[in-house]
Amino acid sequence: MGALIPSSTLFNIFDFNPKKVRIAFIAVGLRGQTHVENMARRDDVEIVAFADPDPYMVGRAQEILKKNGKKPAKVFGNGNDDYKNMLKDKNIDAVFVSSPWEWHHEHGVAAMKAGKIVGMEVSGAITLEECWDYVKVSEQTGVPLMALENVCYRRDVMAILNMVRKGMFGELVHGTGGYQHDLRPVLFNSGINGKNGDGVEFGEKAFSEAKWRTNHYKNRNGELYPTHGVGPLHTMMDINRGNRLLRLSSFASKARGLHKYIVDKGGESHPNAKVEWKQGDIVTTQIQCHNGETIVLTHDTSLQRPYNLGFKVQGTEGLWEDFGWGEAAQGFIYFEKIMNHSHRWDSSEKWIKEYDHPMWKKHEQKAVGAGHGGMDYFLDNTFVECIKRNEAFPLDVYDLATWYSITPLSEKSIAENGAVQEIPDFTNGKWKNAKNTFAINDDY
């Protein structure tokens, strides 16, 4: 597929049974459990082990296996470092990493060094050096990593990709995207009954993501979650495959949303009402590409708002904007020549349905119930099928490093009043001749 390490050398270090992929999980929280569910529904996967110090989450993951008629996974739950013992197991081919962001680097690098293929959940890096580490370790060990960005597989996004590849948008000029999602109920809870949004605690007093994710809003100020927005544009603009991201500039608004949420739900006397939040409510990042396109990302998760990732794809002959969560009718579209220069929007519905990506047409029924409207099926299916077929991942370690780098670079830019930051070429020039093979057929 699309990685830049030759596919013929990807898996030659493994004693590998292509009929059944033996998979383990580092972290089986709410996101990890989605992958557990998808893997448990497959006959070509054996779930070997879970590494997670949280017995409640491990119990939930084991229930998923039981529900799907699978045997219990071996558990490595003796503290934060027990995952290292799991990685010693020679009967594991691949590992899903779905841990808190600050653990991604340690877990991903350790898994590759242990010879385990990595499916890495997405976020942003803590430091730029981490991004280089992913690339260097993958190249040195020959162990591949797939970036698990599910929005690349969203149905409307893939239909637009299909139209882009058919030339309907002409030459692409500009794109926007982001993470525009009211996360306040995710960032705070009571920590008592496992329900998001039922309180205003975070950190050690909280449950699930609020235990760790909210601290990033307290201590950082940047584009914390770039991959949902940049990933789909990346596939349409051939980033790292004939094109690349060159530089960025970021700005952050004031921070008001989280404080107001705490006061409204917990009162002005609540201790967390005194917390000073560094993360701006709205962070915008403008990116310049080698081939002349521009990209604007928006991080907007601390204020009241409906869900919308804010996609815009604009070319010399077409324009699409979305305003919802991925339904076919939740967008506007315009093609100058086809619409006879009418200067009037058309609903995206008929266009999304007519140009539905062949992969969605073929696998729609398999995707039912797979999470996030079915796109998680396609994401996880690609991971497994590439391993089984000894093919390189279409979203690879170079893509992960590129996307992850946006976060620390945006933090630096904001701290320097929007100063332009150069985005490294993590491919070391290989992007010039690499080919885009993301979703090029109806298979995976």
UniProtKB/Swiss-Prot annotation:
Specifically cleaves the blood group A antigen at neutral pH with low consumption of recombinant enzyme. It is therefore a good candidate to participate in the development of universal red blood cells by removing blood group A antigen. NAD(+) binds at residues 30-31, 52, 80, 101-104, 107, 121-122, 150, 208-212, 225. The keyword Cell cycle does not apply. This is Alpha-N-acetylgalactosaminidase. It holds the Pfam family GFO_IDH_MocA. Binds 1 NAD(+) per subunit. The NAD(+) cannot dissociate. One of its GO terms (molecular function) is alpha-N-acetylgalactosaminidase activity. It comes from Elizabethkingia meningoseptica. Belongs to the Gfo/Idh/MocA family. Glycosyl hydrolase 109 subfamily. Keywords: Glycosidase, Hydrolase, NAD. It catalyses: Cleavage of non-reducing alpha-(1->3)-N-acetylgalactosamine residues from human blood group A and AB mucin glycoproteins, Forssman hapten and blood group A lacto series glycolipids. Substrate binds at Y179, R213, Y225, P226, T227, H228, Y307. Its EC number is 3.2.1.49.
